């Protein structure tokens, strides 16, 4: 994509009321703009990142046999009244009425809808186990939205729901989703720490939160340092991970902690996912059942959430420097930034145009503007593409281009042929 034809409204200065790094860089790099308190528009560059994260999530979910659906944003209030949760959400849930004066809600989550869906469509126990997921916008009227897309009122979420015939099968589904989440986060360049958590208004009696370590995090985590190696091991052992000590601040007790204090790490963390075993909380109140051997039984359920739009902010929090964002390759809006330092030089112009054509517009953001070299380099660092391809003085004098890695700042000099052979296929 040619920068001259693209829309990236960058900011030179940080707005006065913005302090968190992810909020600063998501505004300055033109990913988002605020429309109202806690509500943001996603601009072209930010939407590309959002879609790339969504694609990683969908690939891992689909690979594990989990089926995608799409459920409505607007839900009948009667379903929430039936489940008993209508009053639990209080002012966080946006309540509306349609033209016929029927009470509706703008869904903050979808347990009621999916339970209703299964109780009216499940025809046989042979359809179990079943896990359905969606990627859908949600709205929760946060009292104090802050930190930009890290804690906003409207957000994109991947939520999944499992249905099983008994407890053992439900725990198998829970463990499968646990593993899928680790695989998703690792592909995004993150190391997730799973901690046992309170189920809150979602319900159930087993729950884990997934956090990434970040100094800006709101949570305080205590964990056995061995868990990092377990998470990053190619052979993910869920039982070992679940049995390794981790705890949020409210559940940690140094006096009763089962492992030596010397092996405990304390860090700040950002929550990026949450999984729950719900048991029959919803199936019992909403009569979601199946029949086997002429016996009617309640469905065992689980639910699993990842804040997709929140992940954009979380990734920036752990992947940036003083100059801007450092996107992991898997989700970067473009793999390459192509900069022609001598745009008036015919040779540099021709080489840049040739590289742009061969790389393809989906892989490269080509700075074809007439801006100064300093502005181009500063913008390149701010936007954070993994690789910076620089056409300049070395190109003219030696026929070589400079390829600089954004994360390490290390540069390589090579011919255009070497570059295309080494990088285009990767």
Swiss-Prot record:
Superkingdom field: Bacteria
Keywords: Aminoacyl-tRNA synthetase, ATP-binding, Cytoplasm, Ligase, Nucleotide-binding, Protein biosynthesis
Compartments, as annotated in UniProt: Cytoplasm
GO cellular component: cytosol
Pfam families tied to this protein: HGTP_anticodon (PF03129), tRNA-synt_2b (PF00587)
GO MF annotation list: ATP binding; proline-tRNA ligase activity
Signal peptide: none
Cytoplasm among keywords: yes
Catalysed reactions, semicolon-separated: tRNA(Pro) + L-proline + ATP = L-prolyl-tRNA(Pro) + AMP + diphosphate
Family membership: Belongs to the class-II aminoacyl-tRNA synthetase family. ProS type 2 subfamily.
Protein name stated in the entry: Proline--tRNA ligase
Organism annotation: Ehrlichia ruminantium (strain Welgevonden)
Lineage: Bacteria, Pseudomonadati, Pseudomonadota, Alphaproteobacteria, Rickettsiales
